[in-house]
Amino acid sequence: VESAEYAHYKNAGYSLEAVNWWVYEKQDVSFDIVPPWTTNNYHWWITKLYPGQYMPMHTDPHTHDSPCKRYWMPLQDHQPGHIFIYENNLVKDYKAGDLYSYIKSQDMHGAANIGHTPRVVLQVTEFI
């Protein structure tokens, strides 16, 4: 089933067959991450964008069904060409381990890597 967001991307000229990024979740790795800032149920994943990869502006479907808080944590210091935007905010000059909280859980966000090294971040959804 094609989502309205997917149709919007296609109408804007994106070829989503050419868009890819790597996602690592708990079941994909041999470790767990327990965010120290929450005691509620949560879901985490790590995204990795290689140079030339991007994620169009989007919302995450799992934030549409229940109240939640969203967090974004870079796992490396900001590097030239590593781009993260949520709503009208360009996040830059960050350090590995900095924690950013979305203003609203369904804020539009997107990322790109026009640099020369992989871009790796942790994303956490806390269900409240």
Predicted regions and their residues:
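Conserved metal-binding segment of the jelly-roll/cupin
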Residues: 92-108
